[in-house]
Every structure is written in structure tokens, then in C-alpha cells.
Amino acid sequence: MPRIELAPEVFDDFDRFFDHQEKYGIEDTSGRIAEINEAIQVLAHSPLIGRKAKAGKRELVIGKESRGYVALYRYVPDIDAVFVLAIRSQRESGYK
């Protein structure tokens, strides 16, 4: 079973989500982060489940509509590890 590691930038992404949700009065921000973390755990069992992205990376689609996110990650089978590189809202363009 692959180990999952979050890049330091992912925590910046979470901070950005908190700021955005606070700005618009959205409740249950911590619940949304928990949903994202729970979805990422799927990669421990199925690291190739995400759609292919550029440069050997993959994207895991999490949730939908206003609760939709995309996690950019790379699976390295040689060391059996998944590196989550960034997370963005499905409504954002590109990664920060």
C-alpha cells in the first residue's frame, strides 16, 4: 500500500480555502478539508485512479459543484509513494 505525502504547498492551498470560505461566510470549512483528506486516502489503495495530467502527474477529482476540488499528485511506484502536490477548487483555473 503506497504511503501518501502532502507537499508543503498543499497547506497553503488549505489556507487559501479557509480565507475564501471565511470571506463568503461559508460554514463547515473544517468539514470540507476533512472530506478532501478522506478522498485523498483512496490513493493509498488505488494510486492510479486519477485522470492523467501533464508530466507524469495525475488529478483526483473530489466532490462536485461548490464542494468540488481537484488534487494534483504524482505516484512513484519504485518507492510506493503518492505525493500530493496541490489542491484547487474545481472552479479555479490552474494550480497555485
Question: Model features per residue range: what roles?
Answer:
Residues Q21, K64-K96:
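Enriched for short, Lys/Arg-rich terminal
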Residues M1-R58, K64, D78:
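Basic, Lys/Arg-enriched alpha-helical interface segments
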